Swiss-Prot record:
EC number(s) from the headed UniProt entry: 5.4.2.10
InterPro entries, per the entry: A-D-PHexomutase_a/b/a-I, A-D-PHexomutase_a/b/a-I/II/III, A-D-PHexomutase_a/b/a-II, A-D-PHexomutase_a/b/a-III, A-D-PHexomutase_C, A-D-PHexomutase_C_sf, A-D-PHexomutase_CS, Alpha-D-phosphohexomutase_SF
Active site per the UniProt annotation: 128
Job description of the protein: Catalyzes the conversion of glucosamine-6-phosphate to glucosamine-1-phosphate.
Keywords associated with the record: Isomerase, Magnesium, Metal-binding, Phosphoprotein
Name the UniProt record assigns to this protein: Phosphoglucosamine mutase
The protein's enzyme class: isomerase
Cleavable signal peptide: none
GO molecular function: magnesium ion binding; phosphoglucosamine mutase activity; phosphomannomutase activity
Organism, scientific name: Synechocystis sp. (strain ATCC 27184 / PCC 6803 / Kazusa)
Family as reported in the entry's similarity comment: Belongs to the phosphohexose mutase family.
Pfam families per record: PGM_PMM_I, PGM_PMM_II, PGM_PMM_III, PGM_PMM_IV
Enzymatic reactions: alpha-D-glucosamine 1-phosphate = D-glucosamine 6-phosphate
Length: 481
């Protein structure tokens, strides 16, 4: 190996002459999925991979912006997040890029600060709602938007080629700086996005923080506005992040709201880019409801151009029909907040989101923000003088919708499920039977080794019947034994 020496405390340490000498073992399939790179920490996501990714991300982002700004890195509480964040920073430094490390913070904080500063990009170390053993690397461009596919492809091409060096000497390497104080600017932004004057006094709120990125900010902001806050899972404990709690496991939040007599509750995922709510009776309030209520408020104040909302193929049919009755229009796109964002830019929509709780409001930001959505929903409750239950009674009754997951580890089978003839036949039979009274959606998850089967129907028994049939077919012909 041709190496350059690093002199440190009298030692000559070998420095690889190219990033290809770190011994990476990359999968044949593309690294980048629907939301950056995600996988098991220590298996797919290793320190050498993060180091090399940092180097190539630095090259691509600097070339794209043609400036010498920093890259901002934030992270959630996972045990592997420190390792990956520091390795990414080292790789970026080796490409001559300065790094600002925020430490623990929500994903939308990284997106906001990237857009509002001279940063050339942002990186969040998080696997969102995934279990503790997973981790992920999310990238943002200089506008605070999820990285365009072209830039992700360029980074991966460099990573797989591994045939270049930075051409920099030690005096040109970047430096890393701890910048946790900058999270305060994001907090100021959130408070500034709310109507003034505002006081949450008299409002009792339960917050499920999922042991994740929102443990510091969310309780502090709600309390600063005068709310009485009961916080669940409120330590940055990466060994428990998302375990039986957070936005995908609402039962603890529901119980706490009922037992404490709270007005409402909010559950965030591990990186707080999504939120789910519950009313005083503990009934779930998903992204469809949040979009409807926030959209109605914007519509009434003439701040919703063309009464347009962007949702996804998962949006409940009852939500769409209720919104149409108010003179609105729902445009559906593929699942994923990046797809919602793209459709919002294309159509000029100011509000969009997903049933899973990613909510984007272009009046304030360009990324899904669970904390912002929670604050605006709480504001609506406080200013209306109505309970969340009363507001929901004026919205819609969702059609029964059953979502089931089938584990399919084989990536090729998972991505090419459409080629399974028995499954296609089963889908056709179900669609013919339900006609216009229901919908079916089968898709491969972009973040987990799962095929998701969603069946929606006006009748709960019908939805359950076809959900059983289709899930069994997927398991039989594609699933793991």
């Amino acid at each position: 190996m041709v190496a350059s020496p690093i002199h440190s405390r009298g030692l000559d340490l070998p420095l690889p002459s190219t990033m290809g000498e770190f011994g990476l073992s990359l999968p044949r399939s593309p690294l980048f999925g629907t939301d950056g790179i995600r996988g098991k920490a220590g298996e797919l996501l290793t320190a050498p991979l993060a180091l090399s990714l940092g180097f190539w991300a630095g090259q691509v982002l600097r070339e794209q912006t043609d400036t010498a700004g920093p890259v901002i890195i934030g992270q959630d509480s996972r045990l592997s997040s420190d390792m990956l964040a520091n390795a990414m920073a080292a790789g970026l430094n080796s490409a001559g890029v300065e790094v600002w490390q925020l430490g623990l913070c929500p994903t939308p904080c990284v997106a906001y600060l990237t857009r509002k500063t001279a940063a050339i990009g942002g990186i969040m170390i998080s696997a969102s709602h995934n279990p503790p053993e997973d981790n992920g690397i999310k990238f943002f461009d200089h506008q605070g938007l999820k990285l365009p596919k072209s830039l992700a492809t360029a980074i991966e091409a460099g990573l797989r080629g591994q045939n270049q060096t930075s051409g920099l000497n030690a005096s040109q390497w970047g430096r890393s700086y701890g910048q946790p104080h900058r999270v305060q600017y994001y907090q100021d932004f959130l408070l500034g996005s709310l109507p003034q004057p505002l006081n949450f006094q008299g409002l009792k709120v339960v917050l499920d923080l999922a042991w994740g990125a929102s443990v510091n900010l969310a309780p502090h902001i709600f309390r600063s506005l005068g709310a009485e806050v009961i916080a669940l899972h409120d330590l940055a404990d990466g060994s428990q992040i998302n375990v039986d709690c957070g936005s995908t496991h609402l039962h603890r939040l529901q119980r706490a709201v009922r037992e404490t007599g709270a007005d409402l509750g909010f559950a965030f995922d591990g990186d707080a880019d999504r939120v789910m709510a519950v009313d005083a009776q503990g009934r779930p309030v998903d992204g469809d409801y949040i979009l409807f209520l926030w959209g109605k408020t914007l519509q009434e104040s003439n701040h919703l151009p063309d009464n347009l909302i962007v949702g996804t193929v998962m949006a409940n049919l009852a939500f769409e029909r209720a919104w149409e009755k108010l003179g609105g229009k729902l445009i559906r796109t593929a699942v994923g907040d990046q797809n919602v964002q793209a459709q919002m830019w294309e159509t000029g929509a100011m509000l969009g989101g997903e049933q899973s709780g990613h909510i984007i409001c272009h009046h304030h930001s360009y990324s899904g923000d669970g904390l912002q959505a929670a604050l605006h929903l709480a504001t609506l409750v406080q200013k209306s003088g109505l309970s969340l239950s009363e507001l929901l009674s004026e919205s819609f009754q969702p059609y029964p919708q059953i979502l089931r997951n089938v584990r399919v580890l084989d990536r090729e089978r998972r991505l090419h499920w459409q080629e399974c003839a028995p499954l296609q036949q089963a889908i056709a039979t179900a669609e013919k039977s339900m006609g216009t009274t229901g919908r079916i959606l089968v898709r491969a998850s972009g973040t987990e080794p799962l095929i998701r089967v969603m069946v929606e129907a006006a009748c709960a028994e019908t939805a359950a019947h076809w959900s059983d049939q289709l899930t069994s077919t997927v398991q039989c012909h594609l699933g793991d034994s």
